[in-house]
């Protein structure tokens, strides 16, 4: 009964009345023009959420409209909800060939990500359209799904291994997994030898995060941590991804950095000669080369935000 089925306009008394859609759009346009004339184009912001990235027309139109008014206040679910992803990549670098896709992989680790409900996951996790069906289909082909989350989510109910860790301890878990992977030689040694710097320094940094120590902070057993590390490290294809929650928790950037680290040391990238998904159908092709792209700063350039003075 409360579903909005027609265009409404709020009256001064706070109630709503119906209005012709074209008239509503005209009135909105007039008000936006007045705001831009009085305060400048930056006063108008655009926010594109996760669903906007799954709607090619909406994403393109929103960008074009925003550019037409000359505003720099363009925000997305990455810049607002998950800034750790861009910030970690800005100091880590990237593999131009891209990481493994979900389809065809034999493992996927979901850290604080519940795509069954959110219909969202970073690339490498279950695609947003019918994620449960995609998870079920890949598991039938042998994929192992690891879920790490303080809550037993819907995705956890469909996983092969679930670790119900304490909130805010994602970096502890990931450090322990990397420690086990390196200690047991489960990393991609050839890939690391050619493309990874400071591997020995990484080994030293994660050494204190033994399964026993991590378990005392995570609230799970050491055996579960080792099982997760071996399940991920022994796989051939598949990546770890994080959702919104880990980025909003303490040390969110570190969490994303460690996820990039885990995927990298395990060599979960598209290498020379491998097939890549969607080489370019609705958008121009992006060159996919088997090489490293140096880290590029994510800040200290472009217009400054007003929120910090």
Q: What is the meaning of each model-derived region?
A:
Residues 29-32, 178, 229, 259-267:
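Short, amphipathic alpha-helical segments that act as regulatory/interfacial helices
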Residues 114, 158-159, 209-213, 241-246:
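Flexible glycine/proline-enriched surface loops and loop-helix/loop-strand junctions
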Residues 1-184, 221:
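N-terminal export/assembly segments and adjacent metallocofactor-ligating motifs
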Residues 39-43, 187-192, 239, 270-277:
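Flexible, glycine/charged-enriched surface loops at secondary-structure junctions
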Residues 203-208, 225-236:
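Core structural elements
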Residues 47-54, 217-220, 243-250, 282:
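Conserved short loop/turn motifs at secondary-structure junctions
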Residues 232-309:
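A glycine-rich, hydrophobic/aromatic-adjacent loop/helix-cap motif
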Residues 6-18, 23, 184-222:
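N-terminal leader/propeptide and maturation segments of large enzyme subunits in energy/redox metabolism
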